[in-house]
Regions:
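Generic beta-strand/beta-sheet core signal
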Residues: 14, 33-34, 188-191, 262-264, ...
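Acidic/polar loop patches that form or flank catalytic/metal-binding clefts of enzymes
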Residues: 39-45, 157-165, 238
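Conserved structured core elements
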Residues: 25, 48, 106, 110, ...
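Structured core elements
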Residues: 30-32, 115, 129-131, 149, ...
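Non-catalytic DNA-recognition/assembly elements of restriction-modification systems
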Residues: 142-153, 168-169, 258-345
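Basic, amphipathic alpha-helical recognition segments used for DNA target recognition
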Residues: 215-257, 267-278, 282
Length: 345
């Protein structure tokens, strides 16, 4: 349709752009729907494959629907989202702003905590927040900068369309949703790149405040880290998770709580724990690198890759059909197990 016009005006095809600040992306999916049919079905990936059925996840598998869950299907600990400030940004600050606050009032230093979400976790960024739940009133009232910020928070909340948020205007020094654990926790990013083989995650000290761009498991055993950082868990996430553009959106209710993992013995847990510890030790060889650096598929250090592959083999040995020749076989096993585990629930 456009070819004659392009030829006439000597136009060429180029990258799409728009007026958005960061050039808003567009993802397009074209799907054909029809009645049940006995016609041949094909999946086109690296090559064309004739299949018996194409399910809702574009796999050659039965039409199983993975449904939201409020608790884990498998024997795994509870995962929860980080805390929500609902503050218009006035409880948050960068390093320079943090130093200015402390310079004005040294007593505020213990109440300014590191603040972390997906981007901070993956790319090693440093941000801070005012964490004032145990801060004495006389300290808060002695800092002019803090008083101004809290007034702005109160104003933001009082103008909210949500009644509950308006009530929180009376307590502008507090986060509206406080889920912060008082022990070390395992943090996973809500949104991460689709290019990585493994989900970047790390253990974080309880003094670091997790925000809602992260998922966390308080006091997570090492073997749980091993299961979640494994290839087979990543394959499950890629199949069932939501998307932001093409990036993965990790949800506890859709990904973690639905993940089918068999019941295993204490001996097997110990094997996973040992292999997972080796992954963490391999990371420690590169203190200058961020998780983004370590899990770049083209730059991943060989010792870290080897540690992950050893862990993958042990985690996958928990499943009945292991070893798996490819991700398709992993998914086939996972969906079968999911169907079995949810049959009576």
């Amino acid at each position: 349709l456009h070819y004659p016009l392009r030829r006439q005006r000597q136009m060429c095809i180029r990258d799409r752009s728009n007026n958005a600040k960061y050039n808003a992306g567009v993802t397009c999916v074209i799907i054909g729907l029809g009645w049940n049919s006995t016609k041949n079905k094909y999946i086109y990936a690296d090559k064309c494959k004739k299949v018996n059925n194409i399910n809702y996840y574009l796999l050659d598998a039965p039409n199983v629907i993975v449904e939201h869950r409020t608790s884990p299907l498998s024997e795994l600990p509870i995962m929860r989202k980080g805390s929500q400030p609902t503050d218009g940004g006035f409880l948050l600050m960068d390093k320079e702003e943090r130093n200015e606050f402390v310079l004005e009032n040294q007593k505020l230093a213990p109440y300014i905590r590191q603040y972390m979400g997906a981007d901070d976790l993956i790319n090693g960024k440093l941000r801070y927040c005012l964490w004032l739940k145990e801060c004495p009133e006389d300290i808060m009232s002695s800092c002019d900068k803090l008083i101004v910020r809290l007034k702005n928070v109160a104003n933001i909340r009082s103008n909210s369309t949500k009644e509950l948020t308006r009530k929180w205007a009376l307590k502008p020094h507090l986060f509206t949703e406080d889920r912060q654990p008082d022990m070390e926790y395992l943090m996973l990013p809500v949104v991460s790149s689709e290019k990585r083989q493994y989900i970047p995650m790390a253990y974080i000290d309880s003094t670091v405040i997790a925000n809602t761009n992260s998922q966390m498991i308080p006091d997570a055993p090492i073997y749980v880290f091993g299961v979640l950082t494994s290839l087979i868990h990543s394959v499950w996430m890629k199949a069932v998770c939501g998307r932001l553009e093409m990036r993965f959106a990790y949800s506890a209710s859709v990904v973690y709580n639905t993940f089918p993992f068999p019941s295993i013995s204490d001996t097997k847990k110990s094997e996973i724990e040992e292999a997972a510890t080796n992954v963490l030790l391999a990371r420690e060889n590169y203190p200058e690198k961020t998780l983004a650096d370590l899990y770049d598929p083209e730059k991943m250090p060989e010792d870290l890759r080897a540690a992950h592959e050893e862990l993958d083999a042990i985690v996958e040995s928990c499943y009945p059909d292991a070893p798996f020749p490819n991700d398709e076989a992993r998914l086939e096993c996972l969906f079968k197990l999911y169907e079995k585990m949810t049959a009576n629930k």
